[in-house]
Amino acid sequence: MSSVYKTKNLQGHERPIKQLKFSKDGKYIFSASADRKVIKWNYKNNSKDSVYMHNASVNVICLSNSNKYMLSGDGAGLIYVWDINTNENIKKITFDKLYNITSLNVSSDDTYFIMTCSERGKQNSFIAIYLLEDIIKIEKEEIKTETENKLQVPSEMKKNIKTEKAPNVFKQINCTKENTKFIKSCFTNMNKSILISREDGILEMYDFTNDTLISSEKFHTSEILDFDVNYENGIIITSSKDGEMSLINLNTFKLMNKFKPINPVRLLNSCQIAVIDNPYYVVPGMKSEISIDTLFDLNTMDITKLRYFENESDKEKAQKFKNKKQIVLACVGGGQDSKFVTTTQQKEGGFEIIIYNVFTGEKLAEFLDHFGPVNTLAVYKDIICSGGEDSSVKVHDIKHYLFS
């Protein structure tokens, strides 16, 4: 692995980063922070496109698959609805009780909006599912396009922003187990099922259509902080407070592998699956024309452009990956609990981002780019974005880490 890597630093937050999301087309990154802001970044030129203001720490965000709406949940238990194409705050949603909102997601067909939360100061937690159209609908005359409603203006200064009670719940799933809470949920299997992580290290699959629990397995000894699903390869990865990452078969719900990146135990706050094209792939049937020294340039698909390797390290990488057209990666980040960060050396805090080959378990890259825990990761193709307790947002080229 090379000690030189490619990183972009996006500067604009003053407090810890809570969550990152790519737009569905990969053009923008959205970063939610404890400084009450969500920033929409055009990361290719390191510029801010818009700033979305709350009155409290913004802890969770999600984007509709139509690339039109963003929903953001804050520490005051409010959800704001934004039109990310016009940069307008459509409305904010309040609830009858004060909730800790721990995850927001939208179904792949944009039919449903799913929220994981617990009542403030109480143990009970639940998952509330709404029709997305009920969440975003608003009377046309209440949508303003004036300059005063652009998102660079703090929300408390805006006029005519509709505040309303949450619509009727379409379906609710309650956590019936004692001494545990739901942490995160999302739709899976063509929106027929819901994947749920819990505080006690259990991952559950719930049948959304028939309202029955399909599977419930304990994959960790402590809270599952994050998970990600890859449907093409039929896998789930989970990261936990116990310092381990699990690889799970989506279809059988059985454990395939365990990864323990850091010893002693550090919190693994976030995990993501990345599937990248392999620049060392040897096209079948072309071995007579192409040897390990002259590989086909997969990026340009031009037979006249051959890749020549200058050293033995490149040859070893080519040999390792040449039979795989795509490489499936597990990316994980975390670190020591933030309350201990000020007394810990950077290298001792476990603040590295680690990339594994999902199926072999081999560590392919490890890099340190934050001065504190990595709180959140987001992946789009071969780009990985990380947000830290140090308030920084970093954009990394995965191929540069793996192949340069």
Sequence positions of predicted segments:
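WD40/WD-repeat beta-propeller blade N-cap
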Residues: L10-I17, Y52-V58, T94-I101, N174-F182, ...
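Short loop/turn segments that connect beta-strands within beta-propeller blades
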Residues: Y43-N46, I84-N87, L132-I135, F208-D211, ...
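Hydrophobic core register within WD40 beta-propeller blades
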Residues: L20, I61, L104, S185, ...
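Hydrophobic beta-strand positions that form the internal "hydrophobic ladder"
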Residues: I29, M70, F113, I194, ...
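Residue-level detector of Asp-centered blade-edge/turn motifs that repeat once per structural unit
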Residues: K24-D25, N65-S66, S108-D109, N189-M190, ...
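WD40 beta-propeller blade core
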Residues: I39, Y80, A128, E204, ...
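A short helix->beta-strand "capping" segment at the edge of beta-propeller domains
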Residues: M1-E14, N45, K165-F170, T360-G361
